[in-house]
Amino acid sequence: METISTRIVSLRKDAGLSQQQLADDLNLSRRAVSLWETGRRTPDIQSVLLLADYFQVSLDYLVKGSHA
């Protein structure tokens, strides 16, 4: 089942980025990115907005997986 965690991993890998590179680009810690990707934490709304803008995807896609 695809989740926000798996979508973050897929988007990051498709962009050819390491967790550290993504964290640096978004001014976040690598640990935060790691926790999101493993599903141990869910990104807050500000981080979700940052991720959607960074990867140029809709909030619907990032949160729910729909391409609306």
What spans do the regions from the language model cover?
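Short basic helix-loop element that most often maps to the first helix and adjoining turn
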Residues: 6-25, 50
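DNA major-groove recognition helix of helix-turn-helix/homeodomain DNA-binding modules
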Residues: 27, 46-61
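Short amphipathic recognition helices of helix-turn-helix/homeodomain-type DNA-binding modules
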Residues: 61-68
